[in-house]
Amino acid sequence: MKLSEELIYRGFKAETTIENPEDLDNRQSKKFYWGADPSADSLTIGNLAAIMMCACFVRHGYEPYLLVGGATGQIGDPKENGERDLKSLEEVEHNKKCIREQVETVIRNAVSRLAPSRPSLRGSGAHSAPVVADGLETAYSNHSLTMVDNLEWFSKINYLSFLREIGKNFSMTQLLDRQFVQNRIGEGGSGISYAEFSYTLIQGYDFLHLYREYGVDLQLCGADQYGNCTSGIHMIKRLENADADVWSTPLVIDPVTGRKFGKSEGNAIWLAASDNGSGNYTSVYDFYQFWMNQPDAAVENLLKIYTLLGKEEIEEILKKHAEHPELRLAQKALARGVTAVVHGAGSAETVENLSETLFSKETDFSEFTEDELTEFAAYLPVIAKGTLLVDALVNTGLAESKKKAREFIAQGAISINGTKVQEDLAVNQTAIIKKGKNKFAIVK
């Protein structure tokens, strides 16, 4: 399958300046960049869709550049309904490091089609990158990921020089016509700061700089960034008399809530698997379960976007799934595939086995050994023996508050080693606490 065919098949096409997608197959220059602002110390599955698109380009011989916005991250991408909180310089620096690790790991895993399965993986979080495949395909080894930070050049730019070269050649009319600007400055809007208003100029200059320094003439982005990205095209045309392009991918919409997958929407699924103090993480187990719980109506598109499975493989999985939907074969393939790309093939295999064990009707929770519970503890929240059940539920995240914890207990939604409990008590033995159908914690 050619690049143009794969992009369309997987749904990686929204607005673009490229009239004929087939032009990507024989493009003379094969360098692109994708940017991420360090507004958090972890990316989300919303970002992951764009990264998977980038990996698709790399598999077809394109050279990738990752721009981590140390400069733009200090301002914040303008929102539709209000100004973002400014991050401290220390936060921005920390977030840049974490994002770099995540993007490189995902692209390398996605390009290499993953290494053979490994027994398990511990501590894959914001600082410790997930398993990276041993044997990288030629596409990646020939074009390793080049990481750049726009703070490197913006820290050296004179403000007046920037206004003379860029500000003088940029139309305010284009900015004022942007929908987010209209929403912010219109009646009932929150207004917009000069810093936010300048964001699109800064992002456009990034494209110009990468064109001048590296010959990058293609930018990839999410559909919500398309307007900002075209600013760079205008600058390159005006100042270098050269052509450049933007290719965007649609935002992925949660089929249950109707909202986009992303950290601004309050339903974020993070790529980091352990907390680094910010709370921006999703455990490998919860990450796997998120994909397992996707509805049948959404799973085909998600398999195309988020896994490395080919067209024939996806069609075969969907055929078998239609024959026996109760087995949830499509959801299992989705959960296994995405978890492997983000957290490594070993983690995907381990958490899949863990899930099957926890959900099996034949499992006797009281018979787990200390070693088995230690293995589970790498993927499930852990609480010390002797903790009161109400406190255990709150401290492991199974309940939002003590009031909620008591309600769950009274409703019979809590069990210890498979036995329902209806009163608060100290959990003194090694055990597995279960809430509802799919939430677990370890007591040890």
Each model region followed by its residue ranges:
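N-terminal catalytic cores of NTP/NDP-binding nucleotidyl/phosphoryl-transfer enzymes
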Residues: 21-78, 219-223
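Divalent-metal (Mg2+/Mn2+/Ca2+)-assisted nucleotide/phosphate chemistry catalytic cores
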Residues: 10, 88-89, 95, 108-111, ...
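Conserved nucleotide- and phosphate/pyrophosphate-binding catalytic cores
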Residues: 235-444
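Active-site-proximal loop->helix
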Residues: 73-95, 102
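Short acidic, glycine/serine/threonine-rich loops at helix termini
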Residues: 76-80, 157-163, 257-265
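Positively charged, low-complexity intrinsically disordered leader regions
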Residues: 1-33
